[in-house]
Amino acid sequence: MEKVDDTLSRTYVNHRSTKLFFASFAALFFELLVIRYLSTEIRVFAYLKNLPLLACFLGIGVGMIYGRRNKVERLFPWDALALFAIIRFAPMLHLTHVGFPDSTYYRLGGQEFAVLAALLKLTTHRWLAIYLMLAIYLIVTIGVLSLITATFVTIGGFVGEYLKIFDPLRGYGINLAGSLAGIVVFTFLAFLATPPVVWVLLGFLLLVPFLWRKPVVIAVFICIVLMHLGPGKNTFWSPYYRIDFAALTPPAGSARTSAYRLSVNHDYHQWALDLSPEFMSKHPNAEPNHYALATYEIPYSLVSNPTSVLVVGAGTGNDVAAALRHGAGHVDAVEIDPVILQLGRKYHPEHPYDSPRVSIHVDDARAFFSKTANKYDLIVFGFLDSQTLFSSFSSLRLDDYVYTLQSLQSARRLMKPGGTMVLSFAGVPFVNQRIFAMLEAAFGHPPVALKTGFAGSGISFIEGATQDRARTLPFPDISDSLHWPNPTIATDSWPFLYLDHRTIPVSLLMLLVVIVLGTNRLLKSSLGVGWTSNTEYRQMFFLGAAFMLLETKGITQLSLQIGRAHV
């Protein structure tokens, strides 16, 4: 009889261990899913990824304290449905380009200005339009963060229910193992470039063992999965972006596609263009090919037949194709996004990546700078402007550590004597001034800045032995206008290229105040305590803040050591 009891006891414990493992698995899997998916569909969260992370943590924490409660579970499917419907249909709801309603926002650029323009049509008062933007910003961000918290309360309840059964050490060990499994599986799915329907399907399958007795919940899960079918064969999901890739109509008389448009996270990112002499001689006025040709020719108007070329931010291959057209002996092409590279390899009209003279490196630029022993006649920085962050646990854009003083110094060390660097960028004035100042600091003398107008405000910065030749090219030399008194240079210690000065944006501060006060109110109303209730709670509050700071610092520092492609 005792053996039977022992067997039943072990079975009971093993069953509960499995449930705790999968609850923890689901919690971390959904956390990464929401952060990754949300940032592609509602742009503001691409720059505020730490806030959805905090909302997930808050929901899981409250749920673990609550445990499973019928009232919370009854609301769970509807909270989840609302959250995923908002994310899925954000473009149709005009939520994708909700912007930052402060001066920092106005320096970001992009389609967010369409929101301001629409509001200005409703009123002639600029400040009223800004206040309306502020209201939209707060409603959208706080509303979405509230839905995230509510959804994760139930998931945290599953974890808490089974965690309390075990002694702390064993329970935490199972919880940690499940959490790591969730991270590994989601990372693997991102590596495979799977679409959101796969993430959502697997995520809700993980929750079925906890809710299988509730047919309404299962029906809602099925609805959420079904609404994620699509959006079409021309949409791809890389580890960093949602990518939409479309062929443009070929010019009259051409039988094949000569230009493709690549968008990331619903905004234009780059073209893949046929700029070959054969095509351009037959179709000299074809657009956007004619418009772009002069910019891609600049480096080779300075350095003819280079023996070795490094292209940083190779993308779909326009810069690589230009190097091959001008007789480059060998080209190292560095691109962090494997899906963009794959699209370029398959569809670029000139097929530059098929050339035996090209070596492809799927890597972070900084990591490549530190690893390579090669020296180059010509280094070309393509248009690297990033529209995402490199980690769910940081507030840095994917390209921030490329545009720092230390990065440019590393690139300079890869130049051969007499070599040339051409850095192209399309930014707002203070960003262009900052890049000018960083190049001057890295090389010891100012660059030549030529206004190309590519992508609206494109500038090509030239450093190296061919600067005098650069001044003879048929582009306006705007170097004098970019001198910036007392410039704030981006460094590895302060890599925020897109902030005009050392500050915390007001829009972010407002959100943080609302979150802190709202969290305290939530804890008081649901648990009867707040973080200010006594010394112990205040200590836990600051320990949590310290944890987030150390986590963010660790992730950003690790990216410098091994490259963001591996973080």
Predicted regions and their residues:
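Alpha-helical transmembrane segments of multi-pass membrane proteins
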Residues: 1-566
